[in-house]
Amino acid sequence: MILQAAGLGLGAAGTGIMMPESVNAAAADFNDISKWPGSTDEAQSSFEQATSYNNFYELGTDKGDPVKNADKLVTEPWTVEVGGECEKGGKYALEDILKPHAFEERVYRLRCVEAWSMVIPWVGFPLADLLKRFEPNSKAKYVEFKTILDPANLPGQKFPVLQWPYSEGLRIDEAMHPLTLMAVGLYGKELPGQSGAPLRLVVPWKYGFKSIKSIVSINFVEKEPKTSWNVSAPREYGFYSNVNPEVSHPRWSQAKERRLDSKSSGFSALFSEKRETEMFNGYADEVAGLYAGLDLRENF
């Protein structure tokens, strides 16, 4: 669907790895996409690790639920509603969102708030390039995003685990930062359902839950928007949620993490020795200036 919407050709889909049918549903490959020069050269997580160990509560709360229930996420047709403090709001079909943009592969570290991490090659384009098309005005201080609301099909939304629809937000300067990615694929393939098809954020210096999946709404707002995890547990999940080894979660330390990558077999890394977590997930040189003068303990 993504490739058709973007007007790109389809390639052969073989991975050489036997996967559950729902993982293989990613299907089409991206051809001839550029490689971003800033990608990390750290050992990547495997496709299986990245698509079978997921947090996507709309599809279930266990790590294996999203891949099992990925076919419950209906992605055709797909539209994104854009509104708030901008000149060109409206309801946009997926193809209208994607067609002007050139995709590239970026290999980013992903740090979960649960103290595990991965390294994933994403396919996408800078979020800033999309947001500028909507011409936000001077009152647009934040950008609010919402995930699809479809309790008839999505098993997790039948229960009040979180405030539905899932909502996230960024300051406008965070959203416009060159590292912030609108992703449409991973490992050279379209995003599967469990990874947030067809459109998700990747904000590599923040904990993973800030990288909202299956986006259907983008809203430019003047005041800090409410976010689902912060509403659910404000002492545990702040608005910023920058990766910070010096600020512990109330129930565990954030100083170290366990890395799931190709050096480990399957998910054995979850029981391996932990590694030190880097400030801003290793992207401090690029993003620390966004928070100059801000108390990162208070604004966690």
Locations of regions flagged by a protein language model:
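N-terminal export signals
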Residues: 1-22
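Structured, non-membrane catalytic/scaffold regions adjacent to prosthetic-group chemistry
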Residues: 26-300
